[in-house]
Amino acid sequence: ISYLLKSLKDFPVDITAVVSVCDDGSSTGRLREEFNTPAVGDIRKVIVSLSETEPLVEELLNYRFKTTSDLNGHAVGNLLLTAMANITGNMSDGIESLSKVLNLKGKVLPLTEDNVVLMAKMHDGTIVEGEHHITEAHSKIKEVYYKHKPIVCDAVIKAIREADCIILSMGSLFTSILPNLICKDVIK
């Protein structure tokens, strides 16, 4: 989605990106576990792609620490988003605040404020828990679903209803695209 948005921001359109928040690997997974927050990695990528700031800011937000401390592997942008969510009280407000600082050309919305867990039922009947385990599974996926039904953000429903055009972006069908579409509130 971030590559598409990087190009779309050059056109005279109002962009609203709805971002799946089920990533649970690497820096995002650790932050989700520690702060019980929605995934921030994909949100960071979308924010960077819509940002109207210097290339150095993009490099900073995507920078991952390489150290032997607990910061190892964390992306600066993921830490900033998590901090903003803590400061403002929720992820949506944290994204909005950081978006103003970074002069975004568009709006970024998390699908949900919930710390969701994506599940997959494989064709062989096994159940796989967690987005990064699903992408690493060697079996064919039959269906994906959430461990607990998420509450879709009201702003997401409003944005979908008011949209002139809805574009489904490139990405993994089962771990990036379908997680937004398996929510009944989104489909309605």
Give short role names for the model-derived ranges.
Residues 22-139:
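Electropositive, gly/pro-rich neighborhoods at or near active sites that engage anionic ligands
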Residues 1-5, 25-28:
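Short N-terminal binding/cap micro-motifs at the start of the first secondary-structure element
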Residues 15-20, 188:
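Short internal beta-strands
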Residues 3-14:
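A short, Lys/Arg-enriched amphipathic alpha-helix followed by its capping loop at the start of a domain
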